């Protein structure tokens, strides 16, 4: 075969490679006696030897076509291409027949044979590429022009030939999907090729990049004329119509070849010429499913608007619900708070956000105009039924922020009084320089918080392990002077459910006075100790042995203590005070008061102090004598003065006043020395609280306990009263009985015993 050329054609690299891998063609070329062997042998150095024009042999043409086809496949491995591709022509030649040189007069028949040539990959690995960029450009332009001219002349009559299919499809069809050992026929590619041929346009140029050659891709790019650029675009569109998967496979199968593309078009597996004068829309491939250039700007605009809308809405003081309500009244489209929230968070679809944006923008402009314009005319128009702006007129109430120091002061006030009056709230507000309404709301919220933290239970002190709730409407003791002189006495007998010892049973202690009618209200016990409960059946002041009880027992290395508590409903309460009956039987109180965490031998001390509502850690042990106990009672009054002559009873050895804050005088003692009445109802103070009784030389036996009765009148407040009772009988089993009666008519009896080792 012979190809016309108007320039020098460097061919040694291709020809030598073809001979190396195709011995038959090498022998054919050597047997041809046309005198071209000198050209072939002298073509080693392109700088010194020139190839004569029109002296290309069939082997050279085959190698050239094979090389071009390798370029069109865009980077298939050269070694694999050499093994899988071949150039076959339609010439009927014998194996041993020499190939004659094709003369210029035989060019029409050669051109007729070129379109029928099935282009397979020919030649082996191409080595020794020493072409200059100018020589490469001339070579490729010449070969492409000749092949295209032959294809244009014979495309009309041979549309279904394999050559046309190969020329059009080899540029974009990967080897992984269409085997090149068979003719390739693609109808769509043929139509595109026919259009290109009718317009006499150049096909896209493809350049091979050798894996071993580290040359920049720019040296292989051939500049084109404006006519060729249009053909390049159409050929590029032809590539994009092939399946996308095939191109992906092509990329995966060709990792060793790097090819470039023009910046305006998506990356291809081929090198394309930059086209700068053409608009982007023409170079954008049709197959790529990317959004248009306007859509990203719309997304950014929507995102920016959503952010701005939220900021301006908050600045104007509207909630998301207000916006949805106002838009429904203004524009007839009701939107929920969730919709507005999703719009601000960009959680809606692009289409819905585009629909919602103009409405929100209009509402925002109207809201800002209303805020800035204070004229009554505009307000009346917007507030008309047709322009309902109730949603716009609603403003979010500013959240009140209270400083730390003010909050601490309010907490102190709350501890003193949880329900202050209006005058007290006004005073607190003036002191803290706060609004009265803010203070009132704070106290209301604080009371609700207190209910959540400490829900109302069945009464009693939170520090006590035993809580009791009692109710009765009958008075316990008459608040008259006949309390002491009355000859009628009722005996309250307490028998423990679990007897401590045979000699420790407490039989009775007298309470002189008058009582009212009986009540059958039953005590309710909430206890952390294991309860032993039963129903109270006795309607009198003498509870049955099966009364509601709770027992706790603690043992240490030095002694064993048992506390037994019974709760008994009393039929006659005092006005608002408490009644406590106490006796001896307590030892090592100083050890007990050192801390609530440890349980000493006199475990009854902690139980009695808790039953009295007092924390044992309030006073230091150094203030008490050995074996002392501390109890607390609310101040109160009986309303009448008792005889001071009873103070000279022999059962009292020492009375000491250790506190000066407030007073709760001991106004009377009964003749037996078992009952002490405390009164703060306007009588002269005899002693101030707390009281310390030091009965070391007294007859405070287990069956005859000393007692303290404290009664408080309604509305009377005062300091805490303390009773300090000591005993020296530490070597015998002691029993102590406590009875605490509140104004509601309930009595809690605590029986404790401690045994010293």
UniProtKB/Swiss-Prot annotation:
Superkingdom, taxonomy of origin: Eukaryota
Signal peptide start and end residues: none
Classification via SMART domains: HOX, POU
Compositional bias segments (type: Polar residues): 19-43, 275-285
Gene3D superfamilies named in the record: Homeodomain-like, lambda repressor-like DNA-binding domains
Membrane-spanning parts: none
Subcellular localization, as worded in the UniProt entry: Cytoplasm; Nucleus
Region annotation Disordered: where it falls in the sequence: 1-43, 271-295, 375-398, 532-574
Keyword annotations: Activator, Cytoplasm, Developmental protein, DNA-binding, Homeobox, Nucleus, Transcription, Transcription regulation
Chain ranges of the POU-specific domain: 294-368
Similarity remark: Belongs to the POU transcription factor family. Class-2 subfamily.
The record's note on its domains: The POU domain controls nuclear translocation.
Protein name: POU domain, class 2, transcription factor 1
Organism: Xenopus tropicalis (Western clawed frog)
């Amino acid at each position: 075969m012979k190809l016309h050329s108007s320039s020098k054609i460097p061919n040694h690299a291709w020809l030598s490679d073809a001979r190396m891998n195709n011995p038959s063609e090498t022998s054919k070329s050597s047997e041809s006696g046309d005198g071209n062997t000198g050209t072939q042998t002298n073509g080693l150095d392109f700088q010194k030897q020139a190839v004569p024009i029109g002296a290309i042999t069939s082997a050279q043409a085959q190698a050239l076509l094979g090389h071009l086809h390798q370029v069109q496949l865009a980077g298939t491995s050269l070694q694999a291409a050499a093994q899988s591709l071949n150039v076959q022509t339609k010439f009927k030649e014998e194996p041993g027949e020499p190939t004659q040189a094709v003369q210029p007069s035989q060019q029409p028949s050669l051109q007729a044979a070129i379109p029928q040539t099935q282009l397979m990959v020919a030649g082996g690995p191409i080595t020794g590429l020493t072409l200059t960029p100018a020589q490469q450009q001339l070579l490729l332009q010449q070969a492409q022009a000749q092949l295209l001219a032959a294809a244009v002349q014979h495309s009309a009559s041979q549309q279904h030939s394999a050559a046309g299919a190969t020329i059009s499809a080899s540029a974009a069809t990967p080897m992984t999907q269409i085997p090149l050992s068979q003719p390739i026929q693609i109808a769509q590619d043929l139509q595109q090729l026919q259009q290109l041929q009718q317009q006499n346009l150049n096909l896209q140029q493809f350049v091979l990049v050798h894996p071993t050659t580290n040359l920049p891709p720019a040296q292989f790019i051939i500049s084109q004329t404006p006519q060729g650029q249009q053909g390049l675009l159409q050929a590029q569109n032809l590539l994009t119509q092939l399946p996308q998967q095939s191109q992906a496979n092509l990329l995966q199968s060709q990792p060793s070849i790097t090819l470039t593309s023009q910046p305006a078009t998506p990356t291809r597996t081929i090198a394309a010429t930059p086209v700068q004068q053409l608009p982007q829309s023409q170079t954008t491939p049709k197959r790529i499913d990317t959004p248009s250039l306007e859509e990203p700007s719309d997304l950014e605009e929507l995102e920016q608007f959503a952010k701005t809308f939220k900021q301006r809405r908050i600045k104007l003081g509207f909630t998301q619900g207000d916006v949805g309500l106002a838009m429904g009244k203004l524009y007839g489209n009701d939107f929920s708070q969730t919709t507005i929230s999703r719009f601000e968070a960009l959680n809606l679809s692009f289409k819905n956000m585009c629909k919602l944006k103009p409405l929100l923008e209009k509402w925002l402009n109207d809201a800002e105009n209303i805020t800035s314009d204070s004229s009554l005319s505009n307000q009346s128009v917007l507030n008309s039924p047709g322009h309902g702006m109730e949603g716009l007129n609603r403003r979010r109430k500013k959240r009140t922020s209270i400083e730390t120091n003010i909050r601490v002061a309010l907490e102190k006030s709350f501890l003193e009084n949880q329900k202050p009056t209006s005058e007290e709230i006004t005073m607190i507000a003036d002191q803290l320089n706060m609004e009265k309404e803010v203070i009132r709301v704070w106290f209301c919220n604080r009371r609700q918080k207190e209910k959540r933290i400490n829900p109302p239970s069945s009464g009693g002190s939170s520090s006590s392990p035993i809580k009791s709730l009692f109710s009765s409407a009958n008075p316990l003791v008459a608040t008259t002077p006949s309390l002491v002189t009355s000859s009628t006495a009722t005996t309250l007998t307490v028998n423990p459910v679990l007897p401590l010892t045979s000699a420790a049973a407490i039989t009775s202690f007298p309470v002189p006075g008058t009582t009212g009618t009986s009540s059958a209200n039953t005590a309710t016990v909430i206890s952390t100790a294991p309860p032993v409960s039963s129903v109270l059946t006795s309607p009198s002041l003498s509870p049955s042995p099966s009364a509601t009880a709770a027992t706790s027992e603690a043992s240490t290395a030095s002694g064993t203590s048992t506390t037994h508590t019974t709760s008994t409903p009393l039929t006659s309460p005092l006005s608002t005070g408490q009644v406590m009956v106490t006796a001896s039987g307590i030892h090592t109180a100083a050890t007990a008061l050192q801390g609530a965490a440890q349980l000493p031998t006199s475990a009854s001390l902690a139980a009695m102090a808790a039953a009295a509502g007092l924390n044992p850690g309030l006073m230091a042990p150094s203030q008490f004598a050995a074996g002392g106990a501390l109890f607390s009672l609310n101040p109160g009054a009986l309303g009448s003065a008792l005889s001071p002559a009873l103070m000279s009873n022999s059962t009292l050895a020492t009375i000491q006043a250790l506190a000066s804050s407030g007073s709760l005088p001991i106004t009377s003692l009964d003749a037996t020395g078992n009952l002490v009445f405390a009164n703060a109802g306007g009588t002269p103070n005899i002693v101030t609280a707390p009281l310390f009784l030091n009965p070391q030389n007294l007859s405070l036996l287990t069956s005859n306990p000393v007692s303290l009765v404290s009664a408080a009148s309604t509305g009377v407040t005062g300091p805490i009263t303390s009773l300090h009772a000591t005993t020296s009988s530490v070597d015998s089993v002691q029993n102590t009985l406590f009875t605490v009666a509140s104004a509601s008519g309930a009595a809690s009896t605590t029986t404790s015993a401690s045994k010293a080792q």
